[in-house]
């Protein structure tokens, strides 16, 4: 009998340049513990038995990818990235559809510069959302006091942090639903900052799955220094 259980795919949008790092190359190709940030971001998925494959969206003129050992891994499929994150993810989804993936399959979108994803967080996300009608994302409840500001940088009010979460990745949604949400938002010229915001715009409510706070995205030089120090301390 044919198995109709949905498959799980990973998508890594990696076409950005990370200008705030002020580095000589895109931040995903900076070194962290003997590997690039991007390689660390990929490994958690490549080592997971439930993942069927991985699609990475890269800049058309990317000169760094081909030199990495993982570029020759048959589990990884490369597509061209877009000018924005949403376009890069959409190109990966189009590729999955072209390869015969089902609308009912799950897609986990993960930041290329988020190299510290714990296996336990990935396992928990898969376990909690595999039967969810919408999908969801790893997130962390806000810890610090939050202020809403006006355009001049002055405080308007203090925000109730008990209702605020910081969105992380992976973000996990059905292939068909995410494809439609991203495509429709692009046609409507809606600003989409992550996959969850596209699903929200489509009228759905993604579920928040609490993850580890050290699953940080490398955005500024101090983020990378923190990760290097942490890996040095824990021998990773």
From Swiss-Prot:
Catalytic activity: 2-C-methyl-D-erythritol 4-phosphate + CTP + H(+) = 4-CDP-2-C-methyl-D-erythritol + diphosphate
Top-level taxon of origin: Bacteria
UniProt GO molecular function: 2-C-methyl-D-erythritol 4-phosphate cytidylyltransferase activity
UniProt EC number: 2.7.7.60
Main enzyme class: transferase
Keywords of this entry: Isoprene biosynthesis, Nucleotidyltransferase, Transferase
Site (Positions MEP for the nucleophilic attack): 161, 217
GO biological process: isopentenyl diphosphate biosynthetic process, methylerythritol 4-phosphate pathway
Pfam families: IspD (PF01128)
Residues marked Transition state stabilizer (site): 20, 27
Record-linked PROSITE patterns: ISPD (PS01295)
InterPro entries on file: IspD, IspD/TarI, IspD/TarI_cytidylyltransf_bact, ISPD_synthase_CS, Nucleotide-diphossugar_trans
Pathway: Isoprenoid biosynthesis; isopentenyl diphosphate biosynthesis via DXP pathway; isopentenyl diphosphate from 1-deoxy-D-xylulose 5-phosphate: step 2/6
The protein's role, per its UniProt record: Catalyzes the formation of 4-diphosphocytidyl-2-C-methyl-D-erythritol from CTP and 2-C-methyl-D-erythritol 4-phosphate (MEP).
Family: Belongs to the IspD/TarI cytidylyltransferase family. IspD subfamily.
Name this polypeptide is given: 2-C-methyl-D-erythritol 4-phosphate cytidylyltransferase
Origin species: Pseudomonas syringae pv. syringae (strain B728a)
């Amino acid at each position: 009998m044919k198995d109709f259980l949905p498959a799980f795919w990973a998508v890594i949008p990696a076409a950005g340049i990370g200008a705030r790092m002020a580095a000589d190359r895109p931040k995903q190709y900076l070194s962290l513990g003997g590997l690039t940030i991007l390689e660390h971001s990929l490994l958690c998925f490549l080592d997971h038995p439930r993942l069927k494959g991985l699609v990475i969206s890269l800049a058309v003129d990317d000169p760094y990818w081909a030199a990495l050992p993982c570029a020759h891994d048959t589990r990884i499929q490369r597509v061209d990235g877009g000018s924005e994150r949403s376009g890069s993810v959409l190109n990966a989804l189009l590729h999955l559809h072209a390869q015969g993936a089902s609308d009912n399959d799950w897609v986990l979108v993960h930041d290329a510069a988020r190299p510290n994803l714990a296996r336990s967080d990935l396992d928990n996300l898969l376990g909690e959302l595999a039967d969810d009608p919408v999908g969801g994302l790893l997130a962390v409840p806000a810890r610090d006091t939050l202020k809403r500001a006006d355009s001049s940088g002055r405080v308007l009010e203090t925000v109730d942090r008990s209702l605020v979460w910081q969105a992380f990745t992976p973000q996990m949604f059905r292939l068909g639903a995410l494809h439609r949400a991203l495509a429709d938002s692009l046609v409507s010229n809606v600003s989409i900052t992550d996959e969850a915001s596209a699903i929200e715009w489509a009228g759905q409510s993604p579920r928040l799955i609490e993850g580890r706070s050290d699953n940080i995205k490398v955005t500024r030089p101090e983020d990378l220094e923190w990760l290097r120090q942490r890996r040095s301390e824990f021998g990773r």
